[in-house]
Amino acid sequence: GTQRKGSGVIIDDNHILTIGYIVVEAENINITLSDGKKIPGELAGYDSTTGFGILKTAIPLKLDALEFGDSDKLTKEEMLFIIPHLNEGKPSAANMVSRRPFVGWWEYFLDKPIYTFPMNHSWAGAPLINQYGKILGIGSLYVTEAYVEGMLSPGNLFIPINDLKPIFDDLIQNGRRTKDIKPYMGLSSQINSGKISVTRVNENGPAAKAGIMEKDIILSINNKKIKDMEDFYKTVWSSGGPGSKLNFE
């Protein structure tokens, strides 16, 4: 649609942390505070590798900000809280039930995302906080199998806050990461009968220019056989930065 909305969390006097897909490519950004006050904002930084987005407010917020926690130390025993904007949904308690990898068909991979249960319906951009009010993650997705693959357990996926820390200054100062940039292929894919099947090729992208087409099957890269989606992405990303040439079979 033409409009998107979601939640975010104040991290300093002029910045709000959210999920990038809510705000990326937006022509206008309007921020509604918890008291109903509306202020204009702009996209200060976006990282397609993790999915984080940071907004800059037009005026200082002069409100309490939340601090970053340590998502690497999160345990399944901790009580967590999902806090969406009050106009978007209700806060809810949750538990971390898994830290397994997540692979997205849109050239996206998270090594240790936080899967929570039960589900909060207003997850997009909502902070996941611990009992001390520290941010541990930002809401990204609804998932049907939070506990383990193959077990129906509707929950949410949060991007760990520790994934933001190495690139935070870059996003604030430069609007994007300037180090460890992953190459972009310009295709969507999925596992089909144990093989990587191309489901879409973006017009004028690197894959299209290389002659890759929808419904192609990718067997190997640089003579290395590909076993699954995770292996596919990691092989591409470890073969060189943007501009590197790869041999696809």
Where are these regions (language model features)?
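Conserved active-site neighborhood of the chymotrypsin/trypsin-like protease fold
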Residues: 3-5, 10-91, 113, 122, ...
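A short glycine-leucine-enriched loop at secondary-structure breakpoints
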Residues: 7, 69-73, 126-127, 206-217, ...
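Catalytic nucleophile loop of clan PA
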Residues: 9, 120-139
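Short beta->alpha transition motifs characteristic of CBS
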Residues: 12, 18-24, 84, 97-100, ...
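Conserved hydrophobic positions within beta-strands
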Residues: 8-10, 41-43, 96-98, 128, ...
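C-terminal cap/linker of serine protease catalytic domains
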Residues: 63, 82, 89, 113, ...
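PDZ-domain C-terminal substructure recognizer with occasional recognition of PDZ-binding tails
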Residues: 37-38, 42, 169-176, 210-213, ...
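Conserved PDZ fold ligand-binding element
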Residues: 13-17, 132-136, 207-230
